[in-house]
């Protein structure tokens, strides 16, 4: 008699995706982040669903409803901080997942990589709209500044901004539609994740060496499920430590003040996970140029498979490329720091140098160093 998980039409799909999936035996803990992202998404959808039961998307009551959740709802404070800090954990895992893809050449699976970049855009859009919902000072001014960037688009810019706002400023209509989209997008993300996995399972997983490992496969369960469980325990420990001890560590104190259109905060900045892109945006004095650079800072990921000039897929055996990769990481950390600083000397010039270096490393230096590595290996 055949095992039901191998014969049942629905269970067979789950079995082939998560249980009997042939997986390279050499993949390291850097491959844990895919499953961690799935768990983060589940946590966000569940906590978000319960928060939505108590939240009201009206400018007069949004701030009060969030206060009500924290004070009057059973474990409402925990739901709220799990959701807010869960977003931070989501982005930490996301950036590490992308970093692993860059380091080990996973971008050579072009379809999987491209869907991943679309997923990144969808998650960033969801997080931005979620940040607006508590209707604090930083929520309101963040929404005003970021949506206003679209006015840089020639000819249709102003009309486009007013269409998104649903009026002549960020107001009730904006908050209502942002809540609707913030609720809807995670389910679109789930669909995209399924497509992402579909393309991944067409080719199979990459491995640290970048060499095909068809001869050395092991079943996903129990070997990698046990390994992923360790990553999960570490992530849950960090998340609970954040939620229970320092829930506001990554937030902005200004967001505890109700939104006031007549009072601009001294320093408008997004959540920490957008600071690198915000720094690139601010580094260019021209508005349209800044918006284009902001978009390109993420879109450049789509070009990476075409900029790969090496004979070797992974950076494991390319020491010069490794140095450049860690330089890029340091550069991104510098941009994140600059994004949180006021617009004054010396932060302006540091931001401009780091922004130029970001694009220079990805578009020019990486392909050149790949060619140098290729030449040295021949030599």
From Swiss-Prot:
Which CDD domains is this protein grouped with?
cytochrome_b_C, Cytochrome_b_N
State the encoding gene. MT-CYB
Listed under GO cellular component are: mitochondrial inner membrane; respiratory chain complex III
Which branch of life, at top level? Eukaryota
> What is the protein name for this chain?
Cytochrome b
UniProt-annotated binding residues for heme b b566: 97, 196
The residues the record assigns to binding a ubiquinone are 201
- Taxonomic lineage per UniProt? Eukaryota, Metazoa, Chordata, Craniata, Vertebrata
| Entry's localization field | Mitochondrion inner membrane
- Which membrane topology term applies here? Multi-pass membrane protein
Q: Which UniProt keywords apply?
A: Electron transport, Heme, Iron, Membrane, Metal-binding, Mitochondrion, Mitochondrion inner membrane, Respiratory chain, Transmembrane, Transmembrane helix, Transport, Ubiquinone
Q: Which Gene Ontology terms describe the biological processes this protein takes part in?
A: mitochondrial electron transport, ubiquinol to cytochrome c
Pfam entry (one)? Cytochrom_B_C
Please give the cofactor(s) recorded in the UniProt entry for this protein.
heme b
Family annotation (PROSITE patterns): CYTB_CTER, CYTB_NTER
Describe the family membership recorded for this protein in Swiss-Prot or TrEMBL.
Answer: Belongs to the cytochrome b family.
Asked whether the UniProt record includes Transport among its keywords, one would answer yes
| Stretch forming the signal peptide | none
Write out the function statement from the record.
Answer: Component of the ubiquinol-cytochrome c reductase complex (complex III or cytochrome b-c1 complex) that is part of the mitochondrial respiratory chain. The b-c1 complex mediates electron transfer from ubiquinol to cytochrome c. Contributes to the generation of a proton gradient across the mitochondrial membrane that is then used for ATP synthesis.
């Amino acid at each position: 008699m055949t095992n039901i998980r191998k014969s049942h039409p629905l269970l067979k799909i789950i079995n082939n995706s998560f249980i009997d999936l042939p997986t390279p035996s050499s993949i390291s803990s850097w491959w844990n982040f895919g499953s961690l992202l799935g768990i983060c998404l589940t946590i966000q959808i569940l906590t978000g669903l319960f928060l939505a039961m108590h939240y009201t998307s009206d400018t007069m009551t949004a701030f009060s409803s969030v206060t009500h959740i924290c004070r009057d709802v059973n474990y409402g404070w925990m739901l709220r901080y799990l959701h807010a800090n869960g977003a931070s954990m989501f982005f930490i895992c996301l950036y590490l997942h992308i970093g692993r893809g860059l380091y080990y050449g996973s971008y050579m699976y072009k379809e999987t990589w491209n869907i991943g970049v679309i997923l990144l855009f969808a998650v960033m859009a969801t997080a931005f709209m979620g940040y607006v919902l508590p209707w604090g000072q930083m929520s309101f001014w963040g929404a005003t500044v970021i949506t206003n960037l679209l006015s840089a688009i020639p000819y249709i810019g102003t009309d486009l901004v007013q269409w998104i706002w649903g009026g002549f400023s960020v107001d009730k209509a904006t908050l209502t539609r942002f809540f609707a989209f913030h609720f809807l997008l995670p389910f679109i993300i789930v669909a995209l994740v399924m497509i992402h996995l579909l393309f991944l399972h067409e080719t199979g997983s990459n491995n640290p060496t970048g060499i095909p490992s068809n001869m050395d496969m092991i079943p996903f369960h129990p070997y990698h499920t046990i390994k992923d469980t360790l990553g999960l325990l570490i992530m849950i420990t960090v998340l609970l430590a954040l939620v229970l001890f320092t829930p506001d560590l990554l937030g902005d104190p200004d967001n505890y003040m109700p939104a006031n259109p007549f009072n601009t905060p001294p320093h408008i900045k997004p959540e920490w996970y957008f600071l690198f892109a915000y720094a690139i945006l601010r580094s260019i004095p021209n508005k349209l140029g800044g918006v284009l650079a902001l978009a390109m800072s993420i879109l450049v990921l789509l070009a990476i498979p075409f900029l790969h000039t090496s004979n070797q897929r992974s950076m494991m055996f390319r020491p010069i490329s490794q140095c450049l990769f860690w330089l890029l990481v340091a550069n991104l950390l510098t941009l994140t720091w600059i994004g949180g600083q006021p617009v004054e000397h010396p932060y302006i010039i540091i931001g401009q140098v780091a922004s130029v270096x970001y694009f220079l490393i990805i578009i020019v230096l990486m392909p050149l160093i790949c060619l140098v590595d290729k030449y040295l290996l021949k030599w």
